[in-house]
């Protein structure tokens, strides 16, 4: 019902146009219960004055004549040659002998028409002949089908775009002039266009062509900004009172550079312990093929700590004393991938290479690092090369703010390509999976739905070192507190010094879009565990290894502003006993993160 009683969230204002719509909703409700002769015979309006609230209040009474309840007596199909009767009958959602349901009856007719439509038969005629037997109270139908030849695409036109080039839009639609029309291919193209993030609306329109059995596909788009300029300040707790607890960042990114669909971005980050300058570029249609090429360059300076050998009476202590050192690094990376787009999902196979050159600075007269990967880069630039390959299946309805669907990926990365010139040789495996369900989608007004989406993720990461090769601390797996184990990783908490070769990270989120496609309120819960080796992840994992967190958050789903603002309470179980995060106790912690999309 569009007319709502006044309450905390409804104004209760009367609109005459809604009255007729509500009458039709009432009739449909009865028709779905088998009362096909139901009628609204009168609408009685009574106005009273509420002296306490000083307003007129209207009471509306619908007078309904229900009539008799009917059962469905089946559907006979005539005129079909292209598809067998058994196949068409299987699309009928009403079973013979069931209570007649008008909505399911119409859905059955639409499903039969869609089968033809999806296979290019857009000019067919469908003429249902409904028969009502008032004595037996049965409803039957004879569907007459007038089959015509397949329709072909004459032209594909684009309207509404002012920045984006026509070819950027047309290449996402898997149809060309002369092709047989396919509804599924049109839907696949629309999904691809939405996932570009360039448009707030994509509306298809099928028009008759210049001749019979020719159609024109018109795609009308509404562009949105693809350029993002961000400046930010984040605050974090530090244990050093002389440290500057502020991190500054600035980003510039255009994901549709000059309307060509290419992405160019620059990022600058500055904090007390890290400064980064990075550039990146990507082209999703490299060489005008469905190939994604990306490249990046970065310069970093980090202030780090590492264990060092401390000679004490009676031996050497190598587990309690930390040294400070600085690292200057340069990084280059490039990747090339190919994608295959199907009706149910898109598959991407990508390979890449990365080169990092790093040099460490510290007083070698005072310190000898325990980690040999630190000392190997002292006084000279050490090199670290890696190659990787990744396969990903994406069946999410919308890439940046999904309501349904799933995603799965597997990546293998080998680090260490030059014998004797590099200090680390290991394989890293990353397995990821996501799934989304819409739990509720109820219209509350003409422009807003109350919607809840359940999102779930799990991921496994493993490191396998080559025989005799160490893995430095910077490459080991850990809880970062921003993307996994949100709310943890504060200085001095139970997770801050935990690193390993195996990590299992999962989360579940209940999302309520406030402005769909812009931002939503979320409630999240994270679970994460880190173990020394992959084998121990499967043989020695216990409840003591898990770190938990939960809390509310505000998530921005615009590609140009992918921020997440969260308040996280974190805890763990130790020998079955509840234990708060030792750094935040039960007060919680503010977490600034980014809404990154797995691809």
Predicted segments with their positions:
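Gram-negative/organellar outer-membrane beta-barrel architecture
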Residues: 12, 179-400, 406-407, 452, ...
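Transmembrane beta-barrel strand/turn architecture of Gram-negative outer membrane proteins
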Residues: 264-266, 328-337, 353, 406-416, ...
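Hydrophobic, well-ordered secondary-structure elements that form the walls
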Residues: 193, 252, 281, 391, ...
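Flexible, surface-exposed loop regions and adjacent strand-edge segments
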Residues: 78, 160-162, 310-316, 365-373, ...
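Extracytoplasmic gating/loop element in the C-terminal half of outer-membrane beta-barrel translocons
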Residues: 211, 215, 442-528, 532-534
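Outer-membrane beta-barrel transmembrane domain signature
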Residues: 527-549
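Periplasmic polypeptide-binding modules associated with outer-membrane biogenesis and secretion
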Residues: 1-239, 247, 251, 265-285, ...
